[in-house]
Amino acid sequence: MKPNIHPEYRTVVFHDTSIDEYFKIGSTIKTDREIELDGVTYPYVTIDVSSKSHPFYTGKLRTVASEGNVARFTQRFGRFVSTKKGA
């Protein structure tokens, strides 16, 4: 491997702001912010969604009340479409 071309791999603290949870993960992300956890200073990155807060991973999927495209079309324009063949 060539020297001095790879980014620095280090432990970074990611803060999921939606659930106020902190994760220490190895990463090469660059940041100017720092935070002190457990007496150690780490690079710090805020995120909006993580696997702990995303509905897909938590199992708290919200139900979508909208219908499919065909059902919406039929509802809006169904009265104009003839149900008889050849008409």
From Swiss-Prot:
Coiled coil: none annotated. InterPro entries: Ribosomal_bL28/bL31-like_sf (IPR034704), Ribosomal_bL31 (IPR002150), Ribosomal_bL31_B (IPR027493), Ribosomal_bL31_sf (IPR042105). GO terms for cellular component: ribonucleoprotein complex; ribosome. SUPFAM superfamilies: L28p-like (SSF143800). Keywords: Ribonucleoprotein, Ribosomal protein. GO terms for biological process: translation. GO terms for molecular function: structural constituent of ribosome. It holds the Pfam family Ribosomal_L31. It comes from the Bacteria. PANTHER family: 50S RIBOSOMAL PROTEIN L31, CHLOROPLASTIC (PTHR33280), LARGE RIBOSOMAL SUBUNIT PROTEIN BL31C (PTHR33280:SF1). Part of the 50S ribosomal subunit. Belongs to the bacterial ribosomal protein bL31 family. Type B subfamily. This is Large ribosomal subunit protein bL31B. It comes from Escherichia coli (strain 55989 / EAEC). The lineage of its organism: Bacteria, Pseudomonadati, Pseudomonadota, Gammaproteobacteria, Enterobacterales. The gene is rpmE2.
